[in-house]
């Protein structure tokens, strides 16, 4: 997976005569994997839409995502000695989201003009994007599993085990994501299209490889994490519903928002990609109107997915009691001039409660 402008074969109406003289053409998404005997559809409208929409969207997500996840990382690192297992996963999640949005300015330039950064940076940027795309989804699954064990089974897997257990889990997640990104190091390259007189960062492999990569993206980057989150949070809700207290009600609202946000952000994109893949495989009829609609839908829905990187700080940190208390403590430590900072600094008893690892407080204190 790379941002949508890099997954589309650019084509102008002026090239139609050229294509009629050639019996084969790389039909599809900016990769050289599909050959057909009929010329592709003009993509002037979808390309113009991308040149306007994607740079603005990517720039906005870059600023918001870097700022929000940067704040989360700074606040968590300010009290490293007191980090719980969930806090550690949140820290890695913030790093993953920040690194993902860090590549968006490069893809914004690619969408607005062309790829001007060479094949080396093309491979690195594509791999970095995908590593952190997979890491974000898998770390969310780790957080849900950790909370499931803590609340449903009252088991502190990481707290009671060796201190390196959570670190090894994170290393395993990053290693798996690096493995998933190997196709980017191998097949991504900067390619110049003489007909368009433009260069773009694109994949270069057969259609079968492209389909396999999409299946990997769908299963490892969406379906499996979503199933883990849905199962774990459904069991958590079953426990919380039979309990009472305002704290647990807040926890119940939070776990519902977590799953809904992930599903709403990424489900539309994967549905559109599924339709596009079925069109590539011939299972769905391809026509110019449908192709243009799918191209635009991929751009819009992928933007919705990337927005999840900006939502994570809000859902997992700013909504959490423990994070807000840590943030005020950090502001006081840095010498916040506003008297309200001192007024909102938590008392010792409140800090002790929110840092506890009991079944009730450990989740609501996220």
UniProtKB/Swiss-Prot annotation:
Gene3D superfamilies: Rhodopsin 7-helix transmembrane proteins. Residues 1-55, 110-124, 189-221, 276-299 are extracellular. The keyword Transmembrane applies. The modification Sulfotyrosine is found at residues 25, 27. It is a multi-pass membrane protein. GO terms for cellular component: external side of plasma membrane; plasma membrane. Residues 77-88, 146-167, 243-254, 321-366 are cytoplasmic. GO terms for molecular function: C-C chemokine binding; C-C chemokine receptor activity; C-X-C chemokine binding; C-X-C chemokine receptor activity; signaling receptor activity. Its main location: membrane. Keywords: Angiogenesis, Cell membrane, Chemotaxis, Disulfide bond, G-protein coupled receptor, Glycoprotein, Membrane, Receptor, Sulfation, Transducer, Transmembrane, Transmembrane helix. Residues 341-366 are annotated as: Disordered. Sulfation on Tyr-25 and Tyr-27 is essential for CXCL10 binding. N-glycosylated. CDD domains: 7tmA_CXCR3 (cd15180). Disulfide bonds join 122-201. Receptor for the C-X-C chemokine CXCL9, CXCL10 and CXCL11 and mediates the proliferation, survival and angiogenic activity of mesangial cells through a heterotrimeric G-protein signaling pathway. Probably promotes cell chemotaxis response. Binds to CCL21. Upon activation by PF4, induces activated T-lymphocytes migration mediated via downstream Ras/extracellular signal-regulated kinase (ERK) signaling. Belongs to the G-protein coupled receptor 1 family. This is C-X-C chemokine receptor type 3.
